């Protein structure tokens, strides 16, 4: 074979006709790789530049959270620094329902730790699965809440909160009020001073892990402002005493309700205010709306004979009367005026103005009222605060009612002289007596220590002094308020027994029994009013039912405040005049006596 015709064997790694095809394939591969690279670069550009903020927000939404920084509500103290309302740290458990449902096999353990039914808990989570925050249980004890968190269930978290606690419970309930589960004031001084006490929660930005636990605090968004403390005018010792004596009186008389208020006459500070029935603010679930009402502030009553010192203030100011003159004829204990029988419980014959106070004569008071200028009488009642709010700042305070003087009909004017035809609150009444006690200076009642600087002279010091001496006779022998006496102290006061209004007139057997007084009479320090509503057992007279409560509370308060005894051992000359020229022998006084209303058809 010729070597020219010989063909060398093909190279084992070379294929025929591969040149152009290989290049085409190479181009395709390179093109695809280039497209992939461009896509990756574009995606990276989209992630890092175009949609960077969107994805960052999405990531933050999963792991970056703004959490509240809870603040403690301010503590409420009594005037001596004793705590009346404090905030205790608690823990609330909340959940992200969707995350918890992903571990639904652990729901029974969660339910057991929370103290709830497992099926109910699962249903609750399912119903709210579209939310990211749902409370499972509020205000748990920290140890119990930590036991829930220790289960390590995804989506279960804790939030620190505070719960209000009232050490004195029902004793101070009506004054303090209470807060709701979010620690905001709902009634009483908790509501009145809510902004002061609540403070403002702060906020911080944190990073949470997938279990919801905080792994890092990033920054404080808003600084917390804790609530400020509040010091009240209330003296816890006197408050306990007032509450205890009021409770004993209601149990003894089987009355429907009762109220007592004690004021410092020099400042207008409320030292004690108690009502029954009451409630426990630490266990609101068992209370009724009627139990939560501060009756001394929100309820009104016809004051009955406790208004007579105010009538006498107008009489003395008019210049027509002095404590001993003129002589008033009570016309045998009955005065038939415009077809109505205004009557006393006894025939007192001839009385001085002081005697009208001593014996609580309705006939005498009505006669005095009808001799006074209507404008003067109305202005005096109004100046003493009747028909006006005391502006104490207490939520829901009633203003009472007093018709404008020019609209008074003669009969209306007569019965206004002994406390019918107007409505007052217990606070208004005790403030009126405190005004007499402080030389005719009226202070705005205050629940805050230090009192209110607002004051005004409404009657002259001379008239106020005369009224005090006239009112001292009420606790003297043969008068209506002997049971309100206090050993070694002089007492100026006034009893009041009023029929309660009912449909069509006045109820024959339902009474409001009251005593209002000032101690010591020679140098007044305290004024107090006790009102017992509808006593059903024993006597219903104000001097008999409410007088002893006043006596025991004031005796204890004077001792607690270190007020020295005055024990003046004298009585202002007043009461029924003796002598053949004026009146025969007076009937014996078998029991404390008081007023009665006109006939029940009185308008």
Question: Regions from the language model: what does each represent?
Answer:
Residues 1-284, 375-385, 506, 533, ...:
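Periplasmic/cell-envelope proteins involved in peptidoglycan metabolism and beta-lactam response
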Residues 4-7, 85, 208-221, 260, ...:
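Beta-lactam-recognizing serine transpeptidase/beta-lactamase-like catalytic domain environment
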């Amino acid at each position: 074979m010729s070597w020219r015709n010989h063909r060398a064997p093909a190279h084992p790694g070379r294929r025929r006709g591969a040149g152009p095809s290989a290049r085409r394939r190479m181009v395709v591969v390179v093109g695809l790789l280039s497209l992939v690279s461009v896509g990756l670069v574009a995606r990276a550009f989209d992630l890092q530049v175009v949609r960077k903020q969107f994805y960052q927000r999405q990531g933050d939404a999963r792991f970056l959270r703004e959490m509240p920084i809870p603040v403690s509500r301010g503590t409420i103290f009594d005037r001596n620094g004793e705590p009346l309302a404090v905030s205790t740290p608690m823990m609330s458990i909340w959940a992200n329902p969707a995350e918890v449902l992903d571990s639904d096999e652990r729901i029974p353990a969660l339910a057991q730790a929370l103290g709830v039914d497992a099926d109910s808990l699962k249903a609750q989570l399912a119903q709210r699965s579209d939310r990211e925050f749902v409370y499972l249980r509020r205000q748990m004890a920290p140890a119990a809440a930590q036991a829930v968190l220790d289960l390590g269930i995804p989506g279960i978290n804790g939030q620190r909160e505070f719960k209000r606690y009232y050490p004195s419970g029902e004793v101070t309930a009506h004054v303090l009020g209470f807060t709701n589960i979010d620690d905001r004031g709902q009634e009483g001084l908790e509501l009145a001073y809510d902004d002061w006490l609540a403070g403002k929660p702060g906020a911080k930005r944190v990073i949470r892990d997938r279990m919801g636990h905080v792994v890092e605090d990033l920054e404080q968004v808003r600084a917390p402002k804790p609530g400020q403390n509040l010091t009240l005018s209330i003296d816890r010792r006197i408050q306990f005493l007032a509450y205890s004596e009021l409770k004993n009186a209601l149990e003894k008389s089987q009355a429907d309700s009762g109220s007592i208020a004690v004021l410092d006459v020099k400042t207008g500070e409320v030292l004690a205010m108690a009502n029954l029935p009451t409630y426990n603010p630490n266990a609101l679930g068992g209370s009724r709306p009627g139990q939560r009402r501060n009756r001394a502030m929100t309820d009104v009553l016809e004051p009955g004979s406790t208004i007579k010192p105010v009538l006498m203030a107008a009489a003395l100011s008019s210049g027509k009367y002095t404590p001993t003159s003129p002589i008033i004829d009570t016309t045998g204990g009955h005065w038939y005026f415009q077809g109505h029988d205004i009557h006393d419980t006894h025939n007192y014959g001839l009385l001085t103005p002081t005697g009208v106070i001593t014996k609580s004569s309705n006939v005498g008071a009505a006669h005095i009222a009808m001799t006074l200028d209507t404008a003067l009488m109305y202005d005096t009642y109004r100046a003493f605060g009747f028909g006006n709010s005391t502006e104490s700042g207490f939520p829901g305070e009633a203003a009472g009612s007093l018709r404008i003087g020019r609209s008074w009909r003669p009969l209306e004017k007569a019965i206004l002289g002994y406390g019918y035809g107007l409505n007052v609150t217990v606070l208004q009444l005790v403030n009126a007596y405190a005004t007499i006690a402080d030389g005719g200076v009226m202070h705005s009642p205050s629940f805050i220590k230090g009192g209110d600087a607002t004051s005004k002279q409404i009657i002259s010091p001379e008239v106020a002094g005369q009224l005090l001496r006239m009112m001292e006779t009420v606790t003297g022998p043969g008068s209506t308020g002997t049971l309100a006496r206090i050993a070694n102290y002089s007492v100026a006061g006034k009893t009041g027994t009023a029929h309660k209004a009912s449909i069509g007139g006045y109820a024959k057997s339902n009474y409001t029994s009251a005593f209002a007084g000032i101690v010591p009479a020679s140098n007044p320090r305290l004024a107090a009013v006790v009102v017992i509503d509808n006593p059903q057992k024993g006597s219903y007279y104000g001097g008999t039912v409410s007088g002893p409560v006043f006596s025991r509370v004031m005796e204890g308060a004077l001792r607690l405040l270190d007020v020295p005894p005055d024990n003046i051992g004298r009585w202002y000359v007043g009461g029924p005049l003796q002598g053949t020229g004026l009146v025969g022998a007076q009937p014996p006084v078998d029991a404390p006596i008081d007023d009665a209303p006109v006939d029940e058809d009185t308008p």
